[in-house]
């Protein structure tokens, strides 16, 4: 009963203040009721009242629960309290709308309002508190977001102002360095950032020299090209010959892309051995071992590209079992162009380490015969090991010079030949950076001479009458034109062959002209591959079809020469050269000694008719009979003296002069 009377007193007290306040309300305050209270002021008043009366609210709630259990009067008083709380909440919002001058009056009125407000339901208080907390948190986020927005706007404005200032200010035009500046640079260590900036400016100007050349600059295009050569040589480490050749082959913008691509490593690729497994099965196994890989490309059905691996890719159980071969993507191309068929006779003239040979064996399904030739003995070990590991059983390994294979296997004895010729390696600089400085013009000439001999030997091996074959594929890992297009053009002029499409859907066509050289128009059927375009090593591929077994093209005026006749003529020239050298090496005859009688009948016959020796031996007889039985007339040819013969003739003449002088001086000494 004590609790009941206490609540009744509180209820009566809570009802009186609103009545008094309504009577005392001024017309200004009534007008302010219709307006929305300021958000900041309302938050301030509520936050100040909340902590003062929290303990009283909890005790009143317990007493109200007891009243509800005992009688119905408690429920009526609770409803009155609930309604009073609503009225007082409205009055409290009215007080918040007062001006700053009436702060003291608001504080006095707030005390009874706070009691009545807190006597309300607990749910209302909790919701109000959560709203306050969310409002305070939201206000902080809003302030932060506004600050960030202001900062961004300021940065954008500053950037715009700076850009406008740069437009107004006239930029300094690029000028080539003078001779004095270049000499000073040579004395100092290389300044790589300044070199890079100069290279960019020169490339930009050379890309459109007519329009971008600085006004008033008297330098010509060659001056800019010369400076670019020097800067690229010092920045990337190339010798002047190699960088000069690349500048002549490519536009300057593409040249920079090529050089930058040479500085990056090519992705690792592997080839599935279809003799033992399938690409899908191999990929699943390697993925389970932690190898991140993907199919190589649409043009290859057996290639996989490896991004990274948790295990050494060249030491997995699958590698040792011969399920795949570590092989660059560019090495797939010559074999794909060769397209060998089953039960054919194929020659790989430079087979080590066996990547292409094992690919050919897989395409032939271990049928037919493959002659895997390698001239260098140390490389035969890796070739034989890979053949055994990959399960190849149709291959014969041989160790000959590629130029001598026709003597071993016979002329026109095979269906297809793959010649991946030794070259300068200018397409694989990313693997061997020593190529930048080690290769010179003489090296390119030596490689080109060897390649011309090898391709003629490869053509002579192929049988033009083969029902399924008669093809030769020539490839190099070089980008130099003398090693690629010039070699193919030489083969077209010296053998009865023609170029056919390589069967590759991508790649750039070869050069049909370069500098003063003009090649056969069909050289556009060859294919070039570059690292900056195809993301593989620089490579060249050409495919030839042998039309006849003649040694020279049918269109030439000179008759076709067989292999035996060519060997005889070369051996005869060697014999003549050896005889001339022996004669020069003979000691001069002393003046007191009698001269040897060398004017025999045989010697006189040799001097009168130097080809009598050849006719006597029967090696060369021009009056040969044709198939019809008629004797051909000897062909009149102009005598061409080679350089070594001229040197020998000069040496002989000098020797004769010295002998004459000695013969004239001898009688004077005797007298």
From Swiss-Prot:
EC number(s) per entry: 2.1.1.-
Motif (Nuclear localization signal 2): 264-271
Motif Nuclear localization signal 4 in this chain: 639-646
Reactions this protein catalyses: a cytidine in rRNA + S-adenosyl-L-methionine = a 5-methylcytidine in rRNA + S-adenosyl-L-homocysteine + H(+)
Amino-acid positions noted as binding S-adenosyl-L-methionine in the UniProt annotation, renumbered to this chain: 350-356, 374, 401, 420
Family recorded in the similarity comment: Belongs to the class I-like SAM-binding methyltransferase superfamily. RsmB/NOP family.
This protein's name: 26S rRNA (cytosine-C(5))-methyltransferase NOP2B
